[in-house]
Regions:
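Targeting-peptide/extracellular-domain and disordered-appendage signature
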Residues: 1-138
Length: 138
């Protein structure tokens, strides 16, 4: 990204952490990560979107498996504040601002041989098996 002449960005360590909850009805503070391991041919993405003024957080885990199938889960988990990225079995921890973090998930995921089944999420969740996934990654 090229900034206009005279403009600059200054990120402070505290900018990496949670922000004060605003009064906006649709206030949303979210964080997500895309990951890929070319050696293991596995990738995925993980997201938490806090909507504290609505009383919930959206949690999504999606792992692309080497055989083309996916492990997926989405939840709207109850939250009461915007104090942390921790909802629905997922947690993001800032270990060192802008350098290191931990992604944790402990819960069920849907195993889908055919990812296009998510065109109809209700049907996909009814017709595919679930398994437990413990994830703790830095």
């Amino acid at each position: 990204m090229k900034l206009p002449e005279g403009a600059y960005l200054k990120l402070n360590p505290e900018d990496e952490y949670m922000h004060p909850l605003g009064s906006e009805v649709n206030f949303n503070e979210s964080m997500y990560f895309n990951v890929y391991d070319p050696k293991g041919k596995i990738g995925g993405w993980f997201r938490i979107g806090n909507r504290a003024n609505e009383g919930n957080a959206e949690m999504t885990a999606c792992i692309y498996l080497p055989d083309g199938s996916i492990a997926f889960m989405f939840k709207r988990a109850k939250i009461a504040n915007n104090d942390a990225f921790k909802a629905g079995g997922m947690e993001f921890i800032i270990d060192e601002p802008y350098k290191a973090l931990t992604v944790k998930y402990s819960g069920e995921v849907l195993l889908m041989k055919n990812p296009t089944e998510m065109i109809d999420p209700s049907k996909a969740f009814k017709n595919n098996p679930k398994c437990f996934l413990p994830l703790n990654s830095q």
